[in-house]
């Protein structure tokens, strides 16, 4: 998918780029698959900020995506390719033979009129088809991967994302995840064949502050520009270094310090992610 650039008629437009939308075939047509979601803006149930630099962004409706792919044995046809304001990839509206309609994440190469299906096994290895991991050949690129059977996909859902099946071991399948981590996942978990579309999204340049605000991203203030009460790096006369190793606003080391907690599923990690 191409990236569109602009003539530098303003300083912001000089480097700004947007995704080409020629692949989008329709606006949302199934009202039952659109719901309102109240924006948390990074606040918890007490109204306190728990995730900084977030806001509601532009007004939008959430599209209900079929992450479980549990409609077995019924063939579906891709009716439309649509924009989703909540994610950086495109979504497809799939119309099934029994009249049901569901949204799925668009794999690269899937277009209007193509057929997709979900089953435990026995399907062709084509983009958009979903099967259990144990029944997909070694070396295949997959996305929309479940971590727990029946819970719904949690891994490789962003634009250009995929994991590769590296092998099998007892009831597990070994996957190389987008982060580079090698991990064992139960073979009965569902996954979709192919790579998530809109791969060029990573090359898009936001270009201006207002566009970030539309995306729900607030400005970040440097700790060294704050007062000592607000950040460990704050204070001093003029521009000074903090006099200590870089830390978070709460005093935890911020470069290279491991914060991941141990849990039972760590035993399924064969090799850790790349640095």
Curated annotation (Swiss-Prot):
InterPro entries: NA-bd_OB-fold (IPR012340), Rib_uL2_dom2 (IPR014722), Ribosomal_uL2 (IPR002171), Ribosomal_uL2_bac/org-type (IPR005880), Ribosomal_uL2_C (IPR022669), Ribosomal_uL2_CS (IPR022671), Ribosomal_uL2_dom3 (IPR014726), Ribosomal_uL2_RNA-bd_dom (IPR022666). Belongs to the universal ribosomal protein uL2 family. It comes from Aliarcobacter butzleri (strain RM4018) (Arcobacter butzleri). PROSITE patterns: RIBOSOMAL_L2. SUPFAM superfamilies: Nucleic acid-binding proteins, Translation proteins SH3-like domain. This is Large ribosomal subunit protein uL2. GO terms for molecular function: rRNA binding; structural constituent of ribosome; transferase activity. Keywords: Ribonucleoprotein, Ribosomal protein, RNA-binding, rRNA-binding. Residues 257-275 have a biased composition (Basic residues). The gene is rplB. One of its GO terms (biological process) is cytoplasmic translation. Part of the 50S ribosomal subunit. Forms a bridge to the 30S subunit in the 70S ribosome.
């Amino acid at each position: 998918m191409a990236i569109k650039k602009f003539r530098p008629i303003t300083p912001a437009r000089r480097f700004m780029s947007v995704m080409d939308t020629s692949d989008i075939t329709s606006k949302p047509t199934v009202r039952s698959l659109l719901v309102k979601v109240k924006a948390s803006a990074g606040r918890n149930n007490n109204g306190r900020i728990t995730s900084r630099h977030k806001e509601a962004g532009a007004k939008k409706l959430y599209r209900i995506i079929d992450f479980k792919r549990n409609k077995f044995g019924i063939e579906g046809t891709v009716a439309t390719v649509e924009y989703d304001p909540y994610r950086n990839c495109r979504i497809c509206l799939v119309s099934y033979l029994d009249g049901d309609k569901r949204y799925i994440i668009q794999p690269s190469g899937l277009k209007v009129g193509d057929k997709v299906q979900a089953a435990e096994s026995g399907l062709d290895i084509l983009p958009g088809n979903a099967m259990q991991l144990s029944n997909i050949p070694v070396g295949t690129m997959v996305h929309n991967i479940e971590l727990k059977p029946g819970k719904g996909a949690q891994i490789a859902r962003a634009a250009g994302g995929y994991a590769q099946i590296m092998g099998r071991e007892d009831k597990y399948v070994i996957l190389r995840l987008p982060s580079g981590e090698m991990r064992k996942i139960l073979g009965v978990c569902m996954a979709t064949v192919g790579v998530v579309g809109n791969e060029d999204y990573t090359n898009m340049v936001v270009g201006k502050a207002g566009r970030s605000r539309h995306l729900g991203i607030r400005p970040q203030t440097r700790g060294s520009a704050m007062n000592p009460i607000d950040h460990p790096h704050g204070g001093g006369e003029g521009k000074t270094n903090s006099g200590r190793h870089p830390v978070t606003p709460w005093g935890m080391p911020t470069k290279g310090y491991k914060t991941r907690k141990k849990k039972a599923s760590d035993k399924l990690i064969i090799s850790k992610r790349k640095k």
